[in-house]
Swiss-Prot record:
Motif (DGA/G): 1288-1290
Main location, first listed in the record: endoplasmic reticulum
Species: Kluyveromyces lactis (strain ATCC 8585 / CBS 2359 / DSM 70799 / NBRC 1267 / NRRL Y-1140 / WM37) (Yeast)
Cytoplasmic-facing ranges: 44-1441
EC number: 3.1.1.5
Identification of the protein by name: Lysophospholipase NTE1
Lineage: Eukaryota, Fungi, Dikarya, Ascomycota, Saccharomycotina
Active-site residues, record numbering mapped to chain: 1170, 1288
Compositionally biased residues, Basic and acidic residues: 572-585
Motif (GXSXG): 1168-1172
Domain PNPLA: 1137-1301
Lumenal compartment residues: 1-22
Length: 1441
């Protein structure tokens, strides 16, 4: 009752109580508060958030355009597949086959083809391939090349062979039984390819036994199985030539060749002499061709080549030179670099010229040494080279009375020469008739020691022709070299045939008969003139040239020819015949007659140099350019072959033989114009050598062009059977630009070796799709296709030619033959292929694409490295990469400098680039139109120029590592088109201050449809890039793969003074006001503190006197030379710097960079993660340490400010902060700069948590992607880019070294500042109590380690991929790993800037100094002082912020 009467009413009153709170709010205060809020929002959104207004409006468009461009390029390759599948005629296939001869003039072409015939072959018919057949071409169908197996390798027993039919395929699909002999299939020749080998073509010119009027026919036999099949009588002709040497090149003495005795062979080639006597006497394998289907072959008989040699000897010499060049590139180069047959190549050289070791007479040898010593004593110089000349022989004293002599006065007398015996030495000289008789009996070979006779000049009176001592041994050296090489007077003269008019009597065309008769009396005229000059040369050696020339151009022989021809040539000759006569006169040598052999030797003797090398010195290094032909006067020289060990990449030497007095060295490289295959080192010295320099040798051989015929004859007669076999079965292939070699899915029937040019490998994901992935680019010296051939699978990709390319094809069947007959060669190839396959797996596993040594995979892994699986890396998203085509194996052989428009200083730029490339250790040569025209000479504007150009360019690529083509001609010039077609990489030069419109040269580039890599070179007058200007150049140029900023001021613009402007009166007042304002400011600033003073100066420079184009200084440090940086990048020797993430610990990056600069280490590419991306981006932007120091310190102060962080806090749903202050701090450092505007190449990475991939950023606004790379999860929100959320790149790769190696960096300095992983073993059982964890942390006596909390576990989980990537980076070859001692600093210790900076600098300085002292610092190209360094006028400034 009490409850209801007392409590309830009071409770009701309490609930009905009303409270009134009055807060007086003045209208003015409300207005002020609203103003503050609105102002804050306006400042934050409009002014403080300017960075958010920067829209990347061209990023997506660039990506789409680049992809479309690449797809279009791939589509052009697809269209090219059908390019050669249309209708082709016999003529097309014939012209394709004779490309091996090079360009042929019309008369030469007609001379070769007028006797050509075709033969129809039915399936199964046999063609015997020997020299009598001539040059054979397959114009329709397919032929199989078969090789007779030795009995040692024949499996069938004698009874089985006896019971076999005339033609029976054995169990092996690639073998046949013909008349009981087993033949192995080595190659399949298809339509448009020649059956004749390179050696057999040269033999068509050198085979003097073939009669010019003898017709030759192929020996064909129908070998279809059946009792009626005719048997092959006798043995099939031996391989190429029955007179060739057997196993080791020993020739039949009946042919004038004198084999090396077994004792000599054992003393020079131990490895070759180990073969048994049976091997030496074994017959050379026979070669035949079998028609695999009904086919047609075209045959140019050997008589056509002999007629060509008589009528057009210079053209024949050109063909021989072309074949010799291809013999080296196809056969010798494949044998040397791929099959490891260097020994046999050097043995070929030995057999060619050193079989008969002709020593210089002792008195000449001592005279040379004495004269050389006296010259050094007189001049007081240590130079080891003097110019001299040689003569050639020693004389049999028993026959000295049979020859004429001339007296030579010698100056040297010593204790070995009693009295005056050598004061008046008679030199033997044969008279012309004796010399001709001698040379005719030994024209095809050098003389043996027993048959040795000196080559004698004319029998002149000793009183008229008394020689000095120097000229005597110069002529003696020349004569000995000539004798060794088999060069005689008949050798240098074009061959003359007395029955030349009989060749074409069977022809019915009157024009041809008339031309033939004209040629006959011309040849007869030349023959009579030659005989006349031979009789007159004894008395009038100088006038004989004029007389001989008179005979060939008219004079007395004209009347004789009129009697032969019945009409006057001078009255009946037409304009066409005049042109024909001019061409023939050029082919006969023009004014250079060959009758005076003494003048030839005189020309060679003028070029002789004498060199002296001490014991142990190197005369010639392997892979160096040819220096010329050496003759060893005194001493001994080791011929050494250097081979690299594939496992350790170290080279080891092996002495092939030791050359003694009388040996000729450097012959093969000088004749073929190739790099030396061996090293020449003095083993017993001092060694004196006579040298005919390479340039002089080339000039004289071009003058006396018939020398090439003799040299080719000696070379072909000395080839070993293995080289002959290779020559016959290696196929030379020529591809035009954008032509497809083979398509993906084609049968793998051969291995290819790139001889010249460049190819690209493409992979199609689907046969019906145009989606293409570029796999790799292949350049000169690289091979491909081995894996498919050895595993018998189809082609894994499509290969297309980027530019005109030459290749050597090794058939699959040849591999199988080598496996049976030469297991050692096959083992060598198998090791190389296995190594390549291992490297491919290694690259595909960890993302590498470059050819790096596999040092970390073979036997040297540490226990820690074995714990990590390098295949667990998270690959980058390729669609985000702008420079998708960056090649990691930068091995450009040719560079093209092409201006975008007229007026750019291309030649000056080329001069500096070539000097920089040379400073980087690359042998480089530049070609412009002027130098090329001077080489082409009179052929500059005729059809022969294309042939001479291609040969000239190929020769330069052999001699130099990089050839730079300079497009210094107008856009309509053919030279500009040539430069575009020859470039592996095209450098487009553009003036960065001009309008970025498409230039006329770019239109020509697009019209040429080249697929070569194209880089843009932006030339700046100062080291400054206007923010955003680079993207204007790139956004409309989808064909650009990369760009480079280069400071370059043309020399003609340096001295130009600035124009004096006309100042108007109003302008004068403005200038006077500014001057007074400046004085007032200076007086006012004196009374301000330093902090305010800096702000006033900044505002004054920004608003009162702004400079639209600020001047930036150029560093005087040579390591920052832009041309050296470009040269290292283009030559694959770039130096990269990778800066890892680690928060405040990354401030030590600044000290590491300072230490690198002090050590003289240049940086060409920079990459980074998190704080490393920030510091690296600042350095890449200015490429100088001074300005970035202040910016990094300012940023550290902003991030370390507690008040700024508190003002940026937000509700912690996604992150604790909004990210505004962090964004603004980064933006204030980079402003509106884009990554493309950075002075040196730069990239950073981030983690795409939307697509779960790693993003690589190398374009776009710098602040945005650097902010993405620094976005620590939980502290900062992710950055959104095209709908993808980007976080800190350290979660996937905290040290992105892999991307750096993919960009072609040879040396990478990787700085790791990440936290150290806690690898303490844990042991707490199968369950875990949280209270125990807390007590364990507080218990100081506990033996259990601290258990990580949930946050630590999540962090470790996020960094699993990064730890694996870090271990992979440490084991990457070429990486210098740097880890400063910054473990005591936390991630957010930005307030300790100076301390962390000094720690990084001190450690970097000591670390690099330690590497240098231990000689472990990798050599960096371009860092040594060079004579090529340019001294430029540079703008300087003081070292201040």
């Amino acid at each position: 009752m009490w409850l209801t009467s007392y409590v309830l009413p009071r409770l009701k009153n309490i609930l009905l109580l009303q409270f009134h709170i009055t807060l007086p709010l003045n209208y003015l205060v409300l207005l002020l508060l609203s103003t503050v809020i609105i102002t804050y929002l306006f400042l934050r959104t409009r002014i403080l958030s300017n960075y958010s207004q920067l829209k990347d409006d061209v990023s997506d468009e660039n990506n789409i355009n680049r992809k479309d461009y690449m797809d279009a390029s791939s589509a052009s390759f697809l269209l090219n597949r059908e390019k050669h599948k249309g209708f082709t005629s016999y003529l097309d296939e014939f012209l394709s086959a004779i490309k091996i001869f090079g360009y042929l003039e019309k008369p030469v072409f007609h001379e070769l083809t007028k006797s050509m015939k075709t033969e129809k072959l039915q399936e199964g018919e046999i063609v015997l391939l020997d020299d009598s057949v001539g040059f054979t071409i397959v114009v329709e169908g397919t032929l199989e090349i078969l090789h007779k197996m030795d009995n040692r390798h024949s499996n069938p027993s004698g009874d089985a062979a006896a019971n076999a039919t005339a033609f029976e395929p054995p169990s092996n699909d690639d073998g046949y039984l013909i008349n009981g002999e087993k033949f192995q299939l080595l190659n399949i020749v298809k339509t448009g390819n020649p059956l004749s080998s390179l050696v057999s073509i040269m033999k068509l010119f050198s085979n003097r036994s073939t009669h010019l009027n003898e017709g030759t026919h192929p020996s064909t036999t129908n070998n279809t199985p059946g009792p009626g099949s005719p048997n092959l009588t006798g043995e099939i002709n031996s391989f190429l030539d029955s007179t060739l040497p057997a196993k080791f090149g020993s020739a039949d003495s009946a042919n004038g060749n004198h084999p090396i005795s077994p004792m000599e062979l054992e003393s020079t080639f131990d490895n070759l002499s180990e073969a048994s006597e049976n091997d030496r006497s074994a017959k050379i394998p026979d070669i035949i061709a079998r028609a695999a289907s009904d086919c047609t072959i075209a045959i140019i008989p050997s008589s056509s080549f002999q007629r060509l040699l008589v009528k057009y000897p210079r053209s024949a010499s050109h063909i021989i030179q072309m074949i010799l060049t291809k013999l080296y590139r196809v056969t010798f180069k494949t044998a040397h670099t791929y099959l490891g047959l260097t020994n046999e190549i050097i043995f070929t050289e030995f057999q060619s010229i050193n079989k008969d070791n002709l020593k210089l007479p002792e008195y000449f040898r001592r005279s040379i040494i004495s004269y050389f010593t006296n010259r050094q004593d007189d001049t007081g110089s240590s130079a080891s080279t003097i110019q001299k000349r040689p003569q050639l022989h020693r004389r049999d004293s028993n026959n000295s009375l049979n020859y004429g002599s001339r007296h030579v006065v010698l100056n040297s007398r010593d204790q070995y020469n009693p009295g005056d015996l050598l004061s008046n030495v008679p030199l033997p000289r044969l008279n012309p008739q004796q010399r001709n008789d001698l040379s005719n009996t030994n024209s095809s070979s050098t003389l043996s020691r027993a048959d040795y006779r000196p080559i004698i000049l004319n029998n002149f009176s000793s009183s008229q022709f008394e020689e000095t001592e120097v000229s005597s041994w110069r002529l003696a050296l020349v004569e000995i070299i000539f004798q060794q090489l088999g060069i005689t007077k008949d050798t240098i003269e074009p061959p003359i045939s007395d029955d030349f008019s009989l060749h074409d009597h069977s022809l019915d065309e009157k024009g041809l008969v008339r031309r033939s008769s004209y040629s006959s009396f011309t040849s007869l005229s030349s023959s009579i003139a030659t005989h006349s000059s031979n009789h007159l040369v004894t008395f009038l050696p100088r006038e004989s040239q004029q007389f001989s020339r008179l005979n060939r151009t008219g004079g007395k022989m004209a009347s004789h020819s009129k009697r032969l021809n019945g009409s006057s040539r001078s009255n009946s000759r037409t304009d066409r015949s005049e042109s024909f006569d001019h061409f023939r006169n050029e082919n006969l040598g023009g004014d250079n007659q060959f009758s005076d052999f003494e003048s030839v030797k005189e020309d060679f003797s003028k070029c002789i140099k004498i060199l002296k090398f001490e014991e142990g010195e190197t005369i010639l290094c392997q892979n160096s350019n040819p220096q010329g032909i050496y003759y060893l006067v005194s001493g001994e020289v080791d011929v050494i072959s250097e081979t690299k060990d594939g496992n350790t990449d170290e080279s080891y030497e092996r002495t092939l033989y030791t050359a003694t007095e009388g040996y000729i060295l450097g012959y093969l490289s000088s004749i073929l114009g190739c790099k030396s295959l061996v090293t020449l080192k003095v083993s017993k010295g001092p060694a004196y050598l006579g040298l005919i320099p390479y340039n002089d040798l080339e000039r004289l051989c071009d003058k006396y062009f018939m020398i090439y015929l003799k040299l080719s004859e000696i070379l072909t007669n000395s080839l070993s059977p293995n080289l002959l076999r290779l020559d016959y079965f290696l196929e030379w292939i020529q591809l035009d630009s954008s032509e497809t070699l083979f398509n993906q899915g084609d049968p793998a029937n051969g291995v290819y070796l790139v001889l010249n040019g460049r190819l690209r490998q493409l992979f199609y994901e689907d046969a019906d799709s145009d989606i293409v992935t570029q796999m790799a680019e292949l350049s000169k010296g690289e091979s491909f296709g081995e894996v498919e051939v050895l595993t018998a699978i189809h082609r894994l990709n499509t290969v297309v030619a980027i530019r005109d390319t030459e290749l050597a094809r090794i058939p699959r069947t040849l591999f199988e033959f080598l496996a049976v007959e030469h297991p050692s060669i096959m083992i060598h190839v198998s090791r190389m292929v296995a190594k390549k396959a291992m490297l491919m797996n290694f690259k595909s596993g960890i993302g590498f694409s470059g050819s790096q040594p596999i040092t970390k995979l073979i036997g040297d892994e540490t226990a820690m490295q074995k714990r990590y699986d390098f295949n667990l890396n998270i690959k980058s998203n390729k669609s985000s990469k702008k420079n998708e085509l960056i090649s990691n194996t930068v091995n450009y052989k040719t560079l093209t400098l092409l201006p975008i428009t007229e007026g750019l200083p291309v030649e000056e730029f080329a001069y500096k680039l070539i000097n920089a490339l040379r400073q980087c250790g690359k042998t480089t040569i530049g070609l412009n139109q002027r130098t090329t025209l001077s080489h082409l000479g009179r052929h500059a504007f005729n059809k022969l120029s294309k042939l001479k150009q291609s040969g000239y360019f190929a020769e330069l690529e052999e001699l130099y590592e990089i050839v730079v083509y300079i497009a210094d001609t107008p856009v309509s010039s053919s030279w500009t088109q040539t430069c575009i077609s020859q470039g592996d990489c095209i450098l487009l030069l553009a003036d960065a201050t001009c309008d970025p419109k498409i230039g006329e040269f770019e239109r020509l580039l697009l019209k040429s449809k080249t697929t070569a890599r194209t880089d843009l070179i932006l030339l700046h007058p100062e080291r400054y890039v206007v923010p955003g200007s680079t993207s204007k150049w790139l956004k409309n140029r989808m064909w650009i793969q990369s760009h480079h900023h280069i400071q370059f001021t043309p020399m003609e613009k340096v001295a130009e003074p600035d124009p004096i402007p006309n100042i108007k009166p109003l302008s004068q007042l403005v200038e006077k006001f500014k001057e007074n304002t400046k004085k007032t400011q200076e007086n006012f600033v004196k009374f301000l503190p330093d902090s305010i003073k800096t702000t006033v100066e900044t505002l004054s420079g920004k608003y009162i006197d702004p400079k639209p184009n600020p001047k930036f200084y150029t560093s005087v440090d040579p390591i920052k030379n832009d041309f050296l940086r470009l040269a290292r990048t283009l030559s694959g020797q770039a130096v990269g710097l990778v800066l890892g993430g680690g928060g405040a610990r990354g401030l030590s990056h600044l000290g590491i960079i300072k230490a690198l600069e002090e050590q003289g280490i240049p940086i060409d590419i920079i990459g980074g993660t998190s704080i490393g991306s920030f510091v690296g981006g600042l350095y890449a932007m200015d490429y100088d340490l001074v300005p970035i120091y202040g910016r990094v310190k300012k940023f550290a102060g902003r991030v370390g400010s507690l008040w700024r962080m508190l003002s940026d806090l937000t509700w912690p749903v996604t992150s604790y902060t909004t990210g505004h202050e962090f964004n603004r701090g980064i933006w204030k450092s980079f402003r509106d700069y884009r990554i493309e505007d950075f002075w040196i190449s730069y990239y950073c990475n981030s983690t795409n948590i939307t697509e779960s991939v790693q993003e690589i950023h190398s374009s776009g606004f710098a602040w945005r992607y650097i902010r993405a790379s620094m976005s620590l999860a939980g502290l900062l929100p992710p950055i959104v880019d095209n709908g993808n959320m980007l976080l800190d790149g350290g979660y996937v790769d905290n040290l992105p070294v892999t991307e750096m190696t993919q960009r072609g960096c040879k040396i990478v300095f990787a700085v790791d500042v990440g936290s150290v992983d806690d690898r303490t073993p844990m042991s707490y059982g199968d369950s875990l109590n949280g209270f125990w964890i807390v007590l364990n942390r507080w218990n100081p006596f506990s033996k259990h380690p601290n258990i990580p909390n949930m946050a630590e576990i999540q962090m470790r989980l996020g960094y699993v991929a990064s730890v694996n990537a870090l271990e992979r980076a440490k084991s990457t070859p070429g990486v210098v790993y740097i880890r400063p001692p910054i473990e005591n600093y936390a991630t957010l210790d930005f307030g300790k800037f100076e301390e962390i900076y000094q720690v990084g600098y001190a450690y970097g300085h000591d670390f690099l100094q330690h590497l240098q002292e231990k000689n472990e610092l990798p050599p960096i190209a371009g860092t040594t002082t060079s004579a090529y360094a340019d001294k430029e006028n540079m703008l300087q400034r003081r070292n201040s912020i």
